[in-house]
Amino acid sequence: MSADFRHEPVLANEVLELLRPRPGELFLDGTLGGGGHSGLLLEAGARVIALDKDPRALAAATARLARFGEAFRAVRSDFRDAKNVLEALGIGAVDGALVDLGVSSPQLDEAERGFSFSRPGPLDMRMGDTGETLEDLLRRIDERELARILREYGEEPFARPVARAIKAALEAEAPLDTARLAEVVAGAIPRKAWPHRIHPATRTFQALRIAVNDELGALAAWLDGLPGVLAPGGRAAAISFHSLEDRMVKEKFRALTQACTCPPDLPVCACGAKASFAAITRKAVKASDDEIARNPRARSARLRAVEKLR
């Protein structure tokens, strides 16, 4: 296997502590990547079905985890389709589910994938090899929609001037690559407003990646599908890396653990409903200083988990 797809799974000990894998239990890893988290579950004696859109990641992780034999199965799919994948495999429910919403280092490092602004690459940014590329998206949407994406997904305060500059560059320059796109973005932001410690194009590139891959839509679908995917007693964990994702996970997990469905203006509960989920984490779990020193990527990781009661 190529060493490129080996990676240290973030919050490894915390994931094992929260998911509590036992021999023979079945887990769904919605974001296989380098296979780090799947490997941890398999080492604990669990069986794993793992999903990923990236065929190269699938091939590399499958080779790495081949020693576990039939206990491991990899499927090329978006994690938003987890329930459909399980149904196609004849599986009713799993004992645990996990997603790690970070982008793998190989995807960021390979210029041809179009995620990085440190080296010139095509305007792609797809996690897999199908669907609309970044260039397709930028040419399809207008300046106003682009500004909305930058503002909502990247929390870019200069969304309008950045969007205007990107659209102008697309019209004036051909072809436009990722390195040049980063220069265009940086040039649209006043130098005195450049963020500390990160490239001024970081927020824009994050927003565009989220839009190209519909990452928030995929996360919403995975969260909505949890009641139908988990068996009673099953646990779900999500590792997010920016505030938009963490907010979605936090709000959905809170909704799942609420029992009463009465209107909020009703002074006393009349429905008698019981919660079907319980929170395992009261607040987001963060990486230790030691882990961050070993793996700086873990600095922004946030882990939340719930358990299905019935």
Swiss-Prot record:
SUPFAM superfamilies: Putative methyltransferase TM0872, insert domain, S-adenosyl-L-methionine-dependent methyltransferases
Pfam families, per database record: Methyltransf_5
Protein EC: 2.1.1.199
Gene Ontology molecular functions: rRNA (cytosine-N4-)-methyltransferase activity
One of the protein's GO biological processes: rRNA base methylation
GO cellular component, one term: cytoplasm
NCBIfam families in the cross-refs: 16S rRNA (cytosine(1402)-N(4))-methyltransferase RsmH
Protein name: Ribosomal RNA small subunit methyltransferase H
